[in-house]
Regions:
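N-terminal, motif-rich segments that launch catalysis or mediate targeting to/interaction with membranes
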Residues: 2-8, 17-148, 155-240
Length: 240
């Protein structure tokens, strides 16, 4: 995978993540992100992605896009939990790597933005044939990257320290008491699947794909440029 193919891979993920119709990044959300993104890869990029995938994925990137979530419970990968998010001081309208990118033990560089940079560089350096004493696990790098690009576009994975990314904001979702983070992660997609797509994930994916090429086609440039700079304050007691 050359640099141009790598850029195609990243752009495919980013293109999908600007879509307004996808709101939650649970297992189904991550599956949809990767399934749709695959369609925007060049043949060369897709070939190299499949080459890196573990055999059990059977050539399907979407099959491993929740791998990073499942991995966190493993003792050898507890450190990776902090890579799924980054929190800023409450009501700050900016992100500073030196201030915000760390885990609960104040280890620097452990946050989602640093993880995306790190695993992108691992993949890029390998395919640029840059000599390094470190032998990277490129399969893990690909699976981490495909997951973390999804996570960073879930708004509450880039949230405030005070409410732990919305986990402390209690809400009601169709009469079910939960927290705002969980609503964004899974419940919005779950509700949409049942209400509009008869619990058929492939049907929902197809609908989004059709909208990308049809209804939303002329809106892409607007998604890439956010001109409104507003500070939004969460309401600790909300009814949805």
């Amino acid at each position: 995978m050359g640099q141009s193919e790598l850029c195609w891979t990243a752009n495919a993920f980013l293109f999908l993540l600007f879509l307004p119709g996808i709101l939650g990044w649970g297992r189904e959300g991550h599956y949809m992100i990767c399934k749709i993104a695959e369609k925007y890869l060049t043949e060369d990029a897709l070939s190299m992605v499949k080459e890196l995938l573990p055999s059990y994925a059977e050539g399907d990137l979407a099959a491993v896009c929740s791998w990073a979530d499942e991995l966190r419970a493993h003792p050898d990968y507890h450190w990776s939990g902090a890579l799924h998010y980054v929190d800023t001081p409450d009501f700050f309208c900016n992100y500073k790597c030196s201030r915000d990118c760390h885990d609960n033990y104040r280890h620097k560089g452990r946050c989602v933005t640093a993880a995306i940079y790190n695993y992108t560089m691992q993949l890029e350096s390998a395919y640029k044939e840059i000599t390094s004493e470190i032998k990277y696990n490129l399969t893990e790098a690909l699976m981490f990257l495909s997951h973390f690009i999804g996570d960073v576009h879930q708004p509450l994975h880039v949230g405030f320290v005070g409410d732990i990314g919305g986990n402390l904001i209690k809400v009601s979702w169709y009469r079910r008491r939960t927290n705002l983070h969980h609503v964004w992660d899974t419940m919005i997609i779950d509700s949409a699947l049942k209400r509009f797509y008869h619990s058929n994930l492939l049907l929902m994916i197809q609908a989004i794909q059709n909208n990308i090429s049809d209804e939303w086609h002329n809106e892409v440039s607007a998604w890439r440029n956010c001109t409104v700079n507003q500070t939004t304050c969460p309401n600790p007691s909300s009814e949805v």
